[in-house]
Design a protein with these regions (language model features):
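Terminal, low-structured helical/coil segments at or just beyond the last alpha-helical repeat
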Residues: 23-39, 196-267
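TPR alpha-solenoid repeat register
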Residues: 84, 118, 152, 185-186, ...
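Register position in tetratricopeptide repeats
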Residues: 60-61, 94-95, 128-129, 162, ...
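Alpha-helical segment of the N-proximal tetratricopeptide repeat
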Residues: 44-83, 87-94
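Canonical tetratricopeptide repeat
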Residues: 86-87, 121, 155-156, 188
Length: 267
């Protein structure tokens, strides 16, 4: 989905061998050596890649300040890289610094207009700030290059639903059917029920999704409902007991194959 450089990390292992007689160490205190940072490569391209990897790793650990510091070094090594700007936007999104996040994603798209994830991420920032019309445009741009992406379809549906574009929202919702490949049907139904304040029905749709699909598949759809205050984080991530999960033979009956060609919202 996201066009990446293939990044290679060079790992060096240093071994220290003891010389001389074997000593009795039973009474000695073990001291852990201080871990030292490896020097950065001198070559600009290698330094750029190495520091980008450091930034991405820090982001995955939620070390956001460390990620920004590594990105600064990456920018110094090779300025004006769309991948750097996109990652910077993701960091500021996690910090909930919306202005800097939006600026970073727009910079990424200025540098590489066809970067799909920057389109999606910018749409997400606009969506989280209730700018549904602008968000829909960015999600549509993302879908133009990822036409079968259910998360993009779902985001466009939410923009229509929450902005009061009832005709498009209703049309898309009526086109959906349960699928073994994606929980979009259940979360779109849940969003519509939450929106009309039928919490009981909405919760049942969410519960059904978690009975059928893996947690990771559900979480990407549930996140939007959490951000909009419909679900708590605990509700969106709570695993279902094994005895409540559907078996594979039940899935075949419940989830007939569907053609998703008609599921794309009208632009």
């Amino acid at each position: 989905m996201w066009k990446f450089f293939y990044l290679f990390a060079l790992l060096f292992a240093f071994g220290i061998a003891g010389c001389g007689k074997k000593n009795d160490r039973s009474n000695q205190i073990s001291v852990q050596p201080v871990k030292q940072e490896e020097p950065l490569p001198q070559d600009g391209e290698e330094r750029y890649r190495a520091t980008y990897v450091k930034a991405a790793q820090a982001f995955s650990r939620n070390d956001l300040d460390g990620a920004l510091a590594a990105l600064d070094l990456s920018d110094q090594a090779k300025p004006d890289q769309a991948s750097n700007a996109n990652l910077r936007g993701a960091i500021f999104t996690r910090k909930r610094d919306w202005a800097q996040a939006e600026a970073a994603f727009r910079q990424a798209l200025k540098l590489q207009p066809d970067l799909p994830m920057a389109q999606f991420n910018l749409g997400e920032v606009l969506f989280l700030n209730n700018k549904y019309s602008d968000a829909r445009e960015k999600f549509q741009n993302f879908l133009n290059s990822q036409p079968s992406n259910d998360l993009g379809l779902y985001k466009i549906y939410l923009c229509d639903l929450l902005s009061g574009n009832n005709a498009k929202a209703d049309s898309f919702l009526s086109s959906l059917k349960p699928s073994p490949n994606s929980p979009i049907y259940y979360f779109a139904k849940a969003a519509e029920a939450f929106h009309r304040k039928d919490k009981e029905a909405a919760t049942e749709f969410v519960t059904s999704a978690y009975r059928i699909y893996p947690p990771d598949a559900n979480s990407t759809f549930a996140d939007s409902l959490v951000e909009k205050g419909y679900l708590s984080g605990e509700q969106a991530s709570a695993p279902q007991p094994e005895d409540k999960k559907l078996k594979s033979d039940e899935l075949k009956t419940l989830l007939p194959p569907v053609d998703k060609a008609d599921s794309k919202p009208k632009s």
